[in-house]
Design a protein with these regions (language model features):
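A metal-dependent hydrolase metal-coordination microenvironment
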Residues: 17, 27, 32-140, 144
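Active-site-proximal loop/helix segments of hydrolase catalytic cores
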Residues: 150-155
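Short loop->beta-strand "edge-of-pocket" segments that line small-molecule binding or catalytic clefts
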Residues: 147
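N-terminal amphipathic/hydrophobic targeting modules at extreme N-termini
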Residues: 1-2
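Aromatic (phenylalanine/tyrosine) cluster motif
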Residues: 5-9, 14
Length: 155
C-alpha cells in the first residue's frame, strides 16, 4: 500500500472514530493541502456478491453512491473479497471510471468481533477469507504484510 493510501486510510479510520465520539455536526473541517482533492468515501460497504447481508449488486451500489456525491468506496464484505473481485473483473474498465473502489474485508475474529482489514493490493492472503482467528494473530498477520485494520463497529 503506498504511503498516500496508508495515510488516507489511517486518517479515514481516525475520522470515523472522531465522528462517533463527537457526532457528525461537531467534527472539525478537513484541511486540504495544495494539489490534493478531498474525496467522499463510504468506508464500510457490503455487496450482494460478497456478503450474506449485502442486498445490492456492486454496480447498483456504485451508481447510488455517485448519485449521493461519493467519490469512492471501500468494499468490506464479510470474510470475502467476492464483491471486490466482481468489480475488478466485470466493471472496473467499463463504467464508473472516475469512481475509486478499494479492497477491504470485514473479518470475524473469535475474540473481538468484526475487524475491518485493508491490505496492499499485491498481497493475497487466503487466510483472511477464513473466519475465526484470535484478534492478536490477525493484527500480527496484517501488520507483517503492510496492511491496516480497525474496528468495524466502534460503538
Amino acid at each position: 500500500m503506498s504511503e498516500t493510501y496508508r495515510h488516507f486510510f489511517v486518517k479515514a479510520l481516525y475520522d470515523m472514530r472522531e465522528s462517533v465520539i463527537l457526532g457528525m455536526d461537531q467534527r472539525r473541517k478537513p484541511q486540504e493541502k495544495e494539489g490534493t482533492k478531498q474525496m467522499k468515501f463510504d468506508m464500510h460497504c457490503h455487496t450482494k456478491e460478497g456478503s450474506m447481508d449485502g442486498k445490492v449488486p456492486i454496480d447498483d451500489f456504485i451508481a447510488e453512491l455517485i448519485r449521493k456525491g461519493f467519490n469512492g468506496m471501500l468494499v468490506t464484505d464479510h470474510n470475502s473479497y467476492n464483491g471486490y473481485r466482481t468489480w475488478k473483473r466485470n466493471i472496473k474498465d467499463q463504467k464508473f471510471k472516475d469512481f475509486v473502489v478499494l479492497k477491504g474485508i470485514e473479518y470475524d475474529t473469535i475474540d473481538a468481533g468484526h475487524i475491518l482489514v485493508i491490505m496492499p493490493e499485491t498481497i493475497k492472503l487466503k487466510i483472511l477469507e477464513l473466519r475465526g482467528l484470535p484478534v492478536q494473530i490477525l493484527i500480527d498477520i496484517v501488520h507483517k504484510n503492510g496492511g491496516i485494520l480497525g474496528p468495524a463497529h466502534p460503538c
